[in-house]
Amino acid sequence: MQPERAQQVVDILRGWGVAAHVAKASAFRHGVRVVIDWKTEAVWDTDGAAGLEAQVLGDGRLVGFVPPIPGSEREDITAEQQAHLIARADYDLT
């Protein structure tokens, strides 16, 4: 995800009350970090692959994975559509 797009998605999510931040995986890879609870977060789309998927981290350790969301790989997907998919994601860790 380009840094500008990541910031757009974060801004939309924050407007909806979601605790979101830009995640910088490297100098050229950015994504979206969503706080799930006080020790768990999801890091979205920092791998550069098509589609939205997330690694779920608890205390900094991988505890789950959200597989690629169908339809999120479209090239014409908007920032608002990406934010909507992230906001509705299932983080079931049971």
Regions found by a protein language model. Name each.
Residues 1-38:
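Negatively charged, low-complexity tracts enriched in Asp/Glu with abundant Ser/Thr
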Residues 2, 16, 50, 79, ...:
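Generic signature of intrinsically disordered, low-complexity, basic-rich segments
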Residues 6-9, 64-94:
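Ampiphathic alpha-helical segments that act as solvent-exposed interaction surfaces
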Residues 22, 26, 31-33, 45-47, ...:
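Generic detector of ordered, mature protein regions
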Residues 40-77:
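Intrinsically disordered, low-complexity regulatory segments enriched in Ser/Thr/Pro
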